[in-house]
Swiss-Prot record:
PROSITE patterns to which the protein is assigned, alphabetical: PROA
Keyword Electron transport among UniProt keywords: no
Enzyme class label: oxidoreductase
Protein name: Gamma-glutamyl phosphate reductase
Amino acid sequence: MTVETTAEFDVREAVHEAARRARVASRALAQLTTAQKNDALHAAADTLLAAADTVLAANAEDIAAAEAAGTEASLLDRLRLTKARIDGIASGLRQVAGLPDPVGGVVRGSTLPNGLEIRQVRVPLGVVGMVYEARPNVTVDAFGLALKSGNAALLRGSSSAAKSNAALVEILREALRAQQIPADAVQLLPSHDRSSVTHLIQARGLVDVVIPRGGAGLINAVVRDAIVPTIETGTGNCHVYVHAAADLDMAEQILINAKTRRPSVCNAAETVLIDRAVADTAVPRLTAALREHGVTIHGDLPGLVPATDTDWGEEYLTLDIALKVVDNLDAAVEHINTWGTGHTEAIVTGDLAAAREFTSRVDAAAVMVNASTAFTDGEQFGFGAEIGISTQKLHARGPMALPELTSTKWIVWGEGQIRPV
C-alpha cells in the first residue's frame, strides 16, 4: 500500500508497520509455485496496460511539478512515461515470468557415508527494501524481480515521481489481490519525508536487505547509515586500457561505444588509459574520434582540459572522459585499482598473456577483454532482467538477476542417524 504521512503521523512507525506486513506477505510468497508467480506477473502486465491512462495522468502531474521546479531536461526524460514506455514496462514483467525460477534450486548436495543426504537450496531473501531515484519504471522492475524470487518489496522512490509511483503500486497491488496473493507483497513508502529512508535502512529485524539504486550520493548515504544489510549497486568509474599490443581500429570502436552509446549509465567508460608504447599513434587518433562524437577530454596532455585527481575518480555520466598515458600494464592496473569503483574494466590487446594478467589483477565485478564496458548488464550476460550491478564482494557481485535475490538454506534428510558421542 501507499503509506500517507501527515504533520502528526509517525513516519518511523509507518515504515515499521509496512515492514511487518511485508514480513507476513513474504512467508506466503515463499510458498508460491512458479506457475502462481508467473500468472501474477502476467496479470500485473495486463492490469498495467489496462490502466495506462491512469498512470500517464499521474506522471503528467509529476512532470509538471518537475518542470516548475526547473528540473533539467535529462532528468525530465528519466521521469517521463509514455504509452510506449508503459508497453515496455509490461513487456519486462512478461520477460521475468519467462525466466527460470531460482527458488528451490539445488546449489550443491551430496550423500554422506553415514547415509545423510545434504542439499543446499535457494530460498527467498524475505523482505527487500529498494531506495531509488527518478525513474518510475524501477518501481515495476523491482516488483517483478522480487515477486519471481519470492520476496516482498518495500519501495522508496523519489519524491519527483511520487504520483507516478503511487499509481503504479496501486495497480500492482490490484493485480496481486486478483490472484489471491497478499497485496502487501509490494508497498510504497513515503517519498516526501526523507526520514523514511533512515527508518527503512535501520529497520534491522524487519527488513532483510536494502538495495540502493541511483547516483553516488544516494548509494553512499544508504551504505554509510544502514544497519540493515545492504547490497551496493555501485557507481561506475569504468576504464578502457589500450595496451601496447592493441589493434587501434578495435580500440577506437570499443572506446567510442563504451563512452557514447549511453553516457549516463553506470557501465559507460569514464577514463581511457593509453600505453606509452602506442601513445604517439593512439592519442591523436582516439582523441580525434572522441571529439567527433562530442566528447570533452580531460587529461594532462597539451590540448586537453586540464585534469586533476578529481577527474581520475569521476563518474561523469556525461560526454566527458579522462585520458591518461601510462607506462605499462603494471601502471594501468595500479591506476585502475586506485581510482576504479569495482564496476567494469576493459583491456584492448592482442597479447593473450597480458589479457590474462589484466583479468587476474584488476579488482572489478566485470573485466572485459577486447569488448565494450557496455556489456555489463544482466540481459546482455544472458541472465534476463536485473535489479542493478553490485560492486561489492559479499553476497552478490556484478549483475543482480533473480538468483542474486535469493539466499540458501541447508536441508538434511536422514533415516534416524544420530551423531556419535
